[in-house]
């Protein structure tokens, strides 16, 4: 049959099986999985790393944002990398860690969710999506132990509970649901401080977008691996909301307006602070 029909798909593609695309690859061509690759001990190559991702809930959904910088050691490897993606219509994933592996993991995760929907005829629940991502991260543990870790932040709108939810992970695939807001990556310590101060119950989507952008401002202020908004190059964070209406990426024009408002406010605060300190310091000569 194969000789007569050389373009025909192998039988494996025509046989009903698991609703997991990752399981399908593991059974029929495991070399295509990121987890199948092994490095000699201690030989992790220099690789660009994604840095800071933040997420916060609002009334009716969740917002996820990421800066645009990737670093390799002390060097800026990329200024416009995108780290926030739609996992499917009602969920988003942001990546921190080894950029190349993280991007491949996201593409495989997107395909996993699409494959499930086609096989089962329905969307996977939000908890189910979070668990699938956990399993995929666990499969990368061998590379993570050699310094090539991937640590995503997953968020989405729960169609059953009618609210936004946030999930964080560790390098072993451990899954943890976060309340209200969270951040991962090198600037996460500073971003979390901003989120704690600025987030409050009852935010609408517009206010939540401002909160996560301010959190990225604070992270970039203290973490050299996090890139702040760049008005000169017109580089803005990637910010997306997920609600009952689905995944929606914020446009550059809207983000530029938010960044300008925050910058003006912080400029006024800085000038006021300098003025006060100047008058209190006096001339010590």
Swiss-Prot record:
Top-level enzyme category: hydrolase
Propiece residue ranges: 1-50
Catalytic activity from the UniProt record: Cleavage of peptide bonds with very broad specificity
Cysteines joined through disulfide linkages: none
Activity regulation behaviour: The formation of the proteasomal ATPase ARC-20S proteasome complex, likely via the docking of the C-termini of ARC into the intersubunit pockets in the alpha-rings, may trigger opening of the gate for substrate entry. Interconversion between the open-gate and close-gate conformations leads to a dynamic regulation of the 20S proteasome proteolysis activity.
Location of the protein in the cell: Cytoplasm
Gene3D superfamilies (alphabetical): Glutamine Phosphoribosylpyrophosphate, subunit 1, domain 1
Keyword presence, Protease: yes
EC numbers on record: 3.4.25.1
Cited InterPro entries: Ntn_hydrolases_N, Pept_T1A_subB, Proteasome_sua/b, Proteasome_suB-type, PSB_actinobac
Family membership noted in the UniProt record: Belongs to the peptidase T1B family.
Record's protein name: Proteasome subunit beta
